[in-house]
Amino acid sequence: MNYTYDPAEVQYIVRIHNTNIDGTKRIPFALTKIRGIGIRIATAICKRLGIDLRKRAGEMGEDEMKRISDAILDPASVGIPESYMNHQRDIIDGTTSHLIGTRLDADLRMMIERGKKNKRIRAYRLDVGLKVRGQRTKSNGRRGRSMGVSRKK
């Protein structure tokens, strides 16, 4: 069964959670443009809400956008398992939540600062932009820095 859409009826840019989403892409793939939402949780949210995965993001109605927006803010309310969420067992209150956008960035910065206060090597390496998980750094992972070759004068 082939699902086709009419380009004349598509809203080309959809705004959800302060992010512009491409309206021509299918809903789960379009939702991955929101920072903190991956394909796994986007697909799970669409399936739990009963939204057709073949539908384009620009074809969504206002009620569908509202339901998706609410589900992104609180995935547990629609039955998404805790293992899908990106902030499990919070250090302060022990809750599990799903962070998106600037809340995710702020939480990452707080984690790095807390680690630097405790003198953790991982936090220092994250802060400087080096590899964290034991990879070698002599030849790979040189993005962002120019090694350059000095010219003979």
Swiss-Prot record:
GO terms for biological process: translation. It is found in: Cytoplasm. GO terms for cellular component: cytosol; small ribosomal subunit. GO terms for molecular function: rRNA binding; structural constituent of ribosome. Residues 134-153 are annotated as: Disordered. PROSITE patterns: RIBOSOMAL_S13_2. Its main location: cytoplasm. The keyword Ribonucleoprotein applies. Pfam families: Ribosomal_S13 (PF00416). InterPro entries: Rbsml_uS13_C, Ribosomal_uS13, Ribosomal_uS13-like_H2TH. Keywords: Cytoplasm, Ribonucleoprotein, Ribosomal protein, RNA-binding, rRNA-binding. PANTHER family: 30S RIBOSOMAL PROTEIN S13/40S RIBOSOMAL PROTEIN S18, SMALL RIBOSOMAL SUBUNIT PROTEIN US13. Located at the top of the head of the 40S subunit, it contacts several helices of the 18S rRNA. Belongs to the universal ribosomal protein uS13 family. This is Small ribosomal subunit protein uS13. It comes from Encephalitozoon cuniculi (strain GB-M1). The lineage of its organism: Eukaryota, Fungi, Fungi incertae sedis, Microsporidia, Unikaryonidae. The gene is RPS18.
